[in-house]
Amino acid sequence: PVSYVDISNDGIDDLIVDQGVQRCEKSWSIFAGGTGGNNFIFFINPTIDNVKAWDGSGFGGDKENKIFSMLIRSYEIVKWKSKNALKVQVHGVSCNVSGAIGCYNILVASEKGIKKVEGPTPNPQ
């Protein structure tokens, strides 16, 4: 799915694309991901120009156009220091627990990028 939510806390909705739900006729598994999750793309303060600048064949994003990409299992919007932040679920290898337990990181977004402010922390068992 595609979500619009202000994760950069500047009053402008940002665009989040979960590539795990995309399909390709010639390769059904290309977007399927794995135990570590799948690719999510974050467009900070998107405009028509920077959305059009996105190159789907690239990996890692495009900082100049405020496009950031990461491999995660899922995300939710949480409050961190009274502002919107991302709580992202990642594979357990990030915090020395099993993949099934997994970990989370807290990230804050701005036009400069997405920065980890907490984690990785093992999920409660």
Label each residue range with its predicted role:
Residues 64-125:
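Acidic, small-residue rich beta-repeat scaffolds with periodic aromatic anchors
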